[in-house]
């Protein structure tokens, strides 16, 4: 049946769905092309901790059978999807990037995974994560340069999409675990607003910071996967008003767009070439019709964002991973031990004050958008290109400011 000239594994999800619906290719042919690519390059990229081609093909054939029998299919229509190895999967191990959980199979699907399956997405396997989705990296390398980091913690998901193994993958972000890998690997990465995607069945590190996120090679694919994963219905009044009802969403041609260029308190840590690139990009945006662009500064309170994040994050890790630290200390990294021990030194009062400061950031950014009627903020995703080596600590960037503040963040690979 295959008639498209483009290698199928290089199709975006939206393109693949169009080809499948048009009868030009089958879901199985798409999956076979992705499997071939995985077999060709996985030994170099090391993006997968679990992959079973037979399971993937069975899922694809089920979708084709539904199509052939005239049964309606879900939004994903047979598209292959990678799942970060901190989401429960009923039929695959979930090891959280740690030997402590080697071979653990939870026997149920995380809500996000269930939504993917219900939309007839093909769950290909589990992608590499850093240890407990924190700092200590897995084995994945950057597809653009094997001697450089792909970014943590959603490294496998970003690398699998960037290297054309799959068109879509889900990850998480508690600081910069999606925006940073997406930037380093040169693809789209999206962390929606806090709470927009259910976290049931996902590894917990901190209730007020953990976000579900995802990766793609096109902006249309982000929109597609958001509609698959997000909450819906009248039980979520704001979502129901502005997302379920598309008339409540500002459209591309609804001019003018008001955009803020924000350097953020960590601008000084960015490489000069990164600063020059975004300033050049912003100058081009400023010349576009229908866009009003202003350079603004966040309040001085945001100078404390990184300290606040470290304080509440380390404290939460010391609580949630007490069992691993006390009973499996020989199986956890020195880096993770250091985080837990740092958290143990944070008092309850200090933790609560940290949460109060986070709440201040949330309200200040809400006020910032409402008062000034900004539609978007443009800023650097990272401080520069992917650093050399897997164990290099990245320079401070603004990612965690947006995570702390619960606002959506997206990496656009535009320069």
Predicted features and spans:
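Short glycine/serine-rich loop segments
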Residues: 108-229, 404-415
